Swiss-Prot record:
InterPro entries: Phosphatase_YcdX_put, PHP_dom, PHP_phosphatase, Pol/His_phosphatase_N, Pol/histidinol_Pase-like. Zn(2+) 3 binds at residues 74, 102, 132. The keyword Hydrolase applies. It is an enzyme of class 3 (hydrolase). This is Probable phosphatase CA_C0509. Binds 3 Zn(2+) ions per subunit. It comes from Clostridium acetobutylicum (strain ATCC 824 / DSM 792 / JCM 1419 / IAM 19013 / LMG 5710 / NBRC 13948 / NRRL B-527 / VKM B-1787 / 2291 / W). Its cofactor is Zn(2+). Pfam families: PHP. Zn(2+) 1 binds at residues 8, 10, 74, 193. Its EC number is 3.1.3.-. GO terms for cellular component: cytosol. Keywords: Hydrolase, Metal-binding, Zinc. Zn(2+) 2 binds at residues 16, 41, 195.
Length: 244
């Protein structure tokens, strides 16, 4: 299956990644990625950019090397209330937001604690994607999270980085999450979670997992540029944007 979109990518701006935005975009262009989202970590992550960085993202051109560039963020969920480390004013300016749990920003809790954080985060209409939900450090009630994602029209990310060793033990959780999404008709988005340009667009591990559960193509958001743009527009994003 051909994937045209990668929305979970990082640059040197995040403090622990190794290539620039232009290097990421150039790599995307060379391998046929049509839409690249840049999603730096929110400011509570050590080494992450100042909040002004996110407020200034409109300076990034929409088209570079014939790749459409979306301006996003991987925001940190800070507590069981689902609060993010990005102010609402800035949230409203971004093209999309991935919301994730990171242990340097929120202590791993019980299944109930972790699930509550994700469920409450999804009450924020600015959140579009839940990031790396298969992380075994944060066990969750998968059925409850996937059901809430369907209710709130939030995409569930299946993270290739998690399956490539960055979060050991994620495979079984990710497979269960994928199966739950298939059963409930919840859309998923594949993310590379790239911290270097060479992994942009590489969904090899996720592809094998999705094949193993026979995931319907219509539930995968990375296959069609129009599908992801229409999804974000329906949520009030990309107001003055049109695919060329």
């Amino acid at each position: 299956m051909k994937y045209l979109i990668d929305l979970h990518t990082h640059t040197i701006v995040s403090g622990h990644a190794y290539t620039t935005l232009l290097e990421n975009i150039k790599q995307a262009s060379q391998i046929g990625i049509k839409i690249l989202g840049t999603s730096e970590h929110g400011p509570k992550m050590p080494g992450a950019p100042h909040i002004w960085y996110f407020g200034n993202m409109n300076k990034v051109p929409r088209k570079i090397y014939d790749v459409t560039v979306l301006r996003g963020c991987e925001a940190d969920i800070l507590n069981s209330n689902g609060d993010l480390d990005i102010p609402e004013r800035i949230q409203n300016e971004l093209d999309y937001i991935i919301a994730s749990l990171h242990d340097v920003c929120i202590e791993p809790g019980t299944i109930e604690d972790n699930t509550k954080a994700l469920l409450n985060a999804m009450n924020n209409p600015n959140i579009d994607i839940l990031g790396h939900t298969g992380n075994p450090m944060y066990p969750i009630d998968i059925d409850a999270v996937v059901s809430k994602a369907k209710e709130k029209n939030v995409l569930i990310e299946i993270n290739n980085g998690s399956l490539s060793g960055s979060r050991e033990g994620s495979y079984d959780n990710c497979k269960k999450i994928a199966q739950a999404c298939k059963k409930k008709g919840v859309k998923v988005i594949l993310g590379t979670d790239s911290h270097i340009s060479f992994t942009i667009g590489n969904f090899d591990k996720v592809q094998k997992l999705l094949d193993s559960v026979d995931m319907p193509k219509e539930l995968i958001m990375n296959t069609d540029e129009k599908k992801i743009v229409e999804y974000l527009k329906a949520k009030g994003k990309l107001k003055n944007f049109n695919l060329e």
